[in-house]
Amino acid sequence: MAKQKKHPTGTIAQNKKARHDYFIEHRFEAGMVLAGWEVKSLRAGKAQLVDSYVLLKDGEAWLLGSHFTPLTTASTHVIADPTRSRKLLLNQRELEKLFAAVQQKGYACVCLSLYWSKHLVKCEIALGKGKKEYDKRHTERERDSDRELQRAVRTKGKED
């Protein structure tokens, strides 16, 4: 009997900047249409989502701005475009909900992370409302105070 291959598990890439710049309201799981060399580079963890966003046009969702670095061992007869737009696979109901929300002022659709679901690559996209500068500072202050509180609780437990 053939030996079973282990599929990579967990997160491939995260977009931490999106979590910093937006109030995340709704999350969706979308499949992706990928070429063979892209799957190989994702298995190696060579993906960046820093300035990526989701464009909704003609009833379809497209991931733009993501960068998948091609491997040097990839095929030579295929021209690899690392920043090409990639189609996202969503249900019609989800697409309509996204399209209606993005039409409202202040809402954007961004990619939060790429991860493996069994042997498939999934993209977690979210509807977000843009944060103002003072919102970002407020969030940072809350995070710092929580960190201080956790540190105080930890040191108090060690003193006993």
From Swiss-Prot:
Question: Which InterPro entries did the record assign?
Answer: SmpB, SsrA-bd_prot, SsrA-bd_prot_CS
Location (main, coarse)? cytoplasm
> Record keywords: Cytoplasm included?
yes
So which domain of life are we looking at? Bacteria
* Gene Ontology MF annotations: RNA binding
Q: Name one Pfam family in it.
A: SmpB
UniProtKB keywords? Cytoplasm, RNA-binding
One GO term under biological process is:
trans-translation
Task: Give the subcellular location.
Answer: Cytoplasm
Point out the signal peptide segment: none
One GO CC term, this protein: cytosol
Region Disordered, as annotated, extends over 131-160
Q: Which family does it belong to?
A: Belongs to the SmpB family.
Q: What does this protein do?
A: Required for rescue of stalled ribosomes mediated by trans-translation. Binds to transfer-messenger RNA (tmRNA), required for stable association of tmRNA with ribosomes. tmRNA and SmpB together mimic tRNA shape, replacing the anticodon stem-loop with SmpB. tmRNA is encoded by the ssrA gene; the 2 termini fold to resemble tRNA(Ala) and it encodes a 'tag peptide', a short internal open reading frame. During trans-translation Ala-aminoacylated tmRNA acts like a tRNA, entering the A-site of stalled ribosomes, displacing the stalled mRNA.
Protein name per the record: SsrA-binding protein
